[in-house]
Amino acid sequence: MKAIQIGFFDEENRYKKLTELGDPLEKLNSVMNWEIFRDELTRVCQKEDYSKGGRPPIDVIVKFKASVLKRIYNLSYDQTEYQINDRLSFMRFLGIGLNDKVIDAKTIWDFENTLANAEMGEKLFCMFDAVLESEGLITHKGTIVDATFVEAPKQRNSRDENKTIKNGEIPEEWQKPENAHKLAQKDTDARWTKKNNEVHYGYKDHVKCDADSKLITNYAVTDAALHDSNRCIDFLDEKDEALYADSAYSGASIEEQLPENCENCICEKGYRGHPLTEEQKENNGKKSKVRCRIEHIFGFMTGAMHGITIRNIGITRAWFNIGLTNLIYNFCRYEFLKRKSTC
């Protein structure tokens, strides 16, 4: 069978067709200034001196954008490498052609591991948050807080091992030299918890968002067993004019710690013998119309970003990967807001 020769115009025509069909990655590329991340990424990732020769490293922006692709589509490292080779939209997003070298799974893993160990997740998030603030997209007129479970790979431990881990210790058997490989595969930071008769294992993504724009303005990562309200006050600052949250955040302790000019718009909770009055129910309904906007964020992550899960082990990687999820959500929301403003 005669080999098919692909010419320059064939490739251009295919890209043109992708644009006509509404390539979401092209839309994201059109509004993002990826160069704002270059200096920090280079500082953390530059390991070797190539001035004396040798193959130059893959550009840090290409590596970063490969991580963005991996998270948007919730792919494994191997699948990310495969899809970049297979899909023209991925190649165009990265700025590479059919004849260019494609980033491999090991390189993406090493890049993310380096960023995680350098605690770069929060740094990158804050850098983009500064862009959102400078463009006036975050109004601070209303702040919403909530948390969602982030499922992690389940561990098959004995009851005694789980008890030891829950006490903040590592089982002695795992610490033996011959079990070093086993310990590397054990997550001693994730926790089991139960909510509404559903069992969860992993971590929690505690999120603060701007009520007007639905942009995430802060976040924290904890194990799944920590109560939602434990990180609420850490999120608040003097710019916040009103705090919206569900009834899990209600209580005198949070109300007493609110900033002076921050209005308490947390939904009220009924108790045994003290049910909510009709007025309280009506007020809760009004508050919920604003508060529910944060659920749209988690819905986007579950749907458009193909799930809120992680495949890594340990709190360090969890902080990075969950932070990357929040950052990429902001990228996508930013693209939507920019496109909406030009309509």
Tell where the protein language model's regions lie, with residue ranges.
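Charge-patterned, long linear interaction tracts outside catalytic cores
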Residues: T316-C343
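Charged, often Cys/His-bearing segments associated with DNA-binding zinc-finger transcription factors
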Residues: M1-R43, L337-C343
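Trp/Phe/Arg-rich N-terminal binding region typifying the photolyase-homology
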Residues: E48-V60, N74-N113, N117
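Short, well-ordered loop/turn and helix-capping segments at boundaries between secondary-structure elements
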Residues: D86, F90, N117, E241, ...
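Polybasic low-complexity intrinsically disordered regions
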Residues: D78, Y82-N85, I103-E260
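Helix-centered, glycine/charged polyanion-binding patches within enzymatic domains
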Residues: E241-A242, S247-T316, F320
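Basic, short loop/linker segments at the boundary and entry of helix-turn-helix/winged-helix-like folds
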Residues: E26-V68, I72
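Secondary-structure capping and boundary motifs in well-ordered enzyme cores
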Residues: N33, G54-V62, D100-D104, K286, ...
